[in-house]
A protein has these predicted regions:
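Conserved GNAT-fold acetyl-CoA-binding loop/helix
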Residues: 8, 22-42
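Conserved beta-strand-loop-alpha-helix junction that forms the acyl-donor binding cleft
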Residues: 118-128, 146-149
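Conserved acetyl-CoA-binding loop-helix of GNAT-fold acetyltransferases
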Residues: 88, 94-107, 133
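Conserved GNAT acetyl-CoA-binding A-motif
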Residues: 102, 109-122
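A short beta-loop-alpha structural element at the N-terminal edge
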Residues: 1-16
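Conserved acetyl-CoA-binding loop of GNAT-fold acetyltransferases
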Residues: 123, 132-141
Length: 151
């Protein structure tokens, strides 16, 4: 297992991974289709430069990923990371890949002076078991405000 940052050189493998994930578990995906052309454009769009996707690679194929952002607060200098996506293909689960992806995130956090991350976790039995295995982490029910803006 190797780990790579998503970029133009592995975008096609990433798209193939998303197609597989969409076919296997469409209910866990946040989109109805894989926006292949959009992905090809986003990997080089400066707007997404602050987004990091680490891909778990097995023999040239993407089998899992973690996507996150670093950000900070001007007022107090607080630095943190937000994880917005973690997914491992069904055939590769229970092999420690998700834990390895989080380890890659934590190394990147350390290199950037970040000492905590958070995520809005999925609400299903498998996710609860996985996140429940984290040491030094708290699973909280935090009220979230989400508002979709009209274009």
């Amino acid at each position: 297992m190797t780990f790579e940052r998503l970029g133009q050189e592995n975008a096609e493998a990433y798209i193939a991974y998303l197609r597989t994930a969409m076919r296997e578990e469409p209910e866990k995906m946040t989109a109805e289709t894989v926006d292949e052309e959009g992905i090809r454009n986003r990997v080089s769009d400066p707007f997404y430069a602050g987004t990091t996707s680490i891909l778990a690679m097995d023999d040239g194929n993407v089998v899992g990923r973690i996507e996150y952002h670093f950000y900070g607060c001007m007022q107090d200098g607080y630095r943190m990371a937000y994880v917005d996506w973690v997914y491992v293909l069904k055939a590769y689960r229970h092999r420690g890949i998700a834990q390895m992806l989080f380890a890659e995130l934590e190394k990147d956090c350390g290199r950037n002076g970040i000492d905590q991350y958070y995520l809005i976790r999925a609400r299903n039995e498998e996710a609860d078991r996985f996140y429940g295995s984290f040491r030094g982490a708290a699973m909280e029910d935090v009220p979230i405000l989400r508002r979709y803006l009209e274009a």
